[in-house]
Structures are given as C-alpha cells and as structure tokens.
Amino acid sequence: MKVIPLASESLGVRSLATYVKTKDVGILIDPGVALAPDRYGLKPNDIEFEKLREMRNKINDYAKKSNVITISHYHYDHYTPFFDDIYLESKDYAKELYKDKILLIKHPTEFINKSQMNRAKKFLESVKDIAKKIEFADNKTFKFGKTEIKFSPPFPHGRDDKLGYVLITTVKEGKFKFMHTSDTQGIIFDDIRDYIIKEKPNLILMGGPPTYLMHRYGKKNLEKTNENLKYIVENTGAELIIDHHLLRDKKFREKINVDFKTVAEFLGEKNLLLEAYRKEIKQGKDINELFG
C-alpha cells in the first residue's frame, strides 16, 4: 500500500486530502481544500492563494488515478463543492474531480447538522449524474479485490456534535492498515479511542486538536486527548501523523505529548504554516526565514 497525503495545514492550506494506492484500487480521501477567510483580522495573502491553486490541481491530478472517492463530512476543506468562492476556487474542478468515480460518502441526512445537511443536498443534486456510483458509507465496509475500505459509525466533529459528525476511514491491504481519522479533533472521547485500538492500524493520519482555539477547546480536552493518544500508541504501535487543526498553532509541537510527524515531515518536506504565520507574512517577513 502507498499512502500519499496531498494537502494539509503543514503544506500551506486547510485540508486533509490523501491518496491511497493498493494493488486493487486507487482511493482519494476527503478531496477538499480551503483557506481561512480571516485570521488575526487578516485575509489570505497571495502566497496562500497560490498554494490553494497548486493543491487543487494536485488533488485533481490524483483523482485521475483514483477509482474511489470518499467524503467523511461536508466541510469545504474535506470535499470540493460545485460552486465558486474566493477562498475555495472549486467550481471549475468539481465536475472533473467526481466524473465516473465511485463515491463512498457520509450519509446526507443522518447524524448531521443542518448546515452540512444543506451542503450534502446541494452536492448530491450536482454529482448524481456525474458519478459512476454513490454509496452512503456510515458504519459500512466495501471490498475492491482484496482491499477493504471500512468506515466507522459517525463520531462527533470535535468536543461535541454542534459541528456535526465525521467518519473515520480505514484502508486494509493484506496485514497493513491505514487509518484517516478526519476531524475528530484529537481524541477526546473514549469510544473513538477504543474504535481506533480495536482496528489496530499501522499508520494513522489524524486531524489534531484545534489548540489555536484553546478558549473553546479547553485545557481538560487537551489533557484527555494527550492521555488517549498515549494509550493508542501503546496499544497499537502505530506510526502517527497529526496535522490539520493542530497546525494552525505556531506552538503545535509543545501541545502534544507523543511522537508524531506532520504531513510535511512525513513527506520529507518543511512545514509551511502559512495561516498560522499570516501576520508575520503581512509584515513582510521572508518565508524562507520563517520556515527554513
């Protein structure tokens, strides 16, 4: 199995898009990318928009290699909608992305909040005549040759269900398992921790806790996440990649008490935290000095 994370905060955008290739099938997980409309009272800079376009093109290139596309939930950094927005630049990419693909997606009306339900409805109206097949994936397993794609029951997006629910995706080929936890925002809940341990993945790509919003996330939730991360590593031995919300925090490394790599580090690249350092970039500081 080959696992290639495509876009994330450590690569300069909001995303957790990932490509997985097995002998049987090419899988594109959560093919979305976006920019924060506002951070520190600042709009995205030209460098961020360049990265957005670069990552959109990369995701669409890997879509051409994919038979299956999965969507864990309906936030714009996890799927590509059929409308345009300055912080998404998605309209021209969506039709090409989903054309003739098998879509394994979060249920559009069950365990979902109102905002995402509306997005899912519009998405399905646009994609139904383009995709090869559409399956609602919640708590189901799909087989492609000897490859299994397993989806969890819906789990809360973060510390409660106000932001809806997400699916954890696990791809198994032979004895190797790759798990994409999507926006569980760290591991606050024991049932998510126990689900991960039961699956015994070898490699986990996790959307980390939003420590840049500690006033909302809370110290106790971060302590619980660190406790559960330690327990997961001890009981699975999995290699851990943590990115997404966590990498919106300049001091991300000191917030997590287990060994992990960012997506950029996993790929052998430098962390490029464009959103977290938007203020410094606005002040004219050199990117090579910030991230060199």
Curated annotation (Swiss-Prot):
SUPFAM superfamilies linked: Metallo-hydrolase/oxidoreductase
TM region positions: none
InterPro entries reported in the protein's UniProt record: RibonucZ/Hydroxyglut_hydro, UPF0173_UPF0282_UlaG_hydrolase, UPF0282_hydrls
Gene Ontology MF annotations: hydrolase activity
Disulfide links within the chain: none
Record family assignment: Belongs to the UPF0282 family.
Name the UniProt record assigns to this protein: UPF0282 protein MJ1629
Organism: Methanocaldococcus jannaschii (strain ATCC 43067 / DSM 2661 / JAL-1 / JCM 10045 / NBRC 100440)
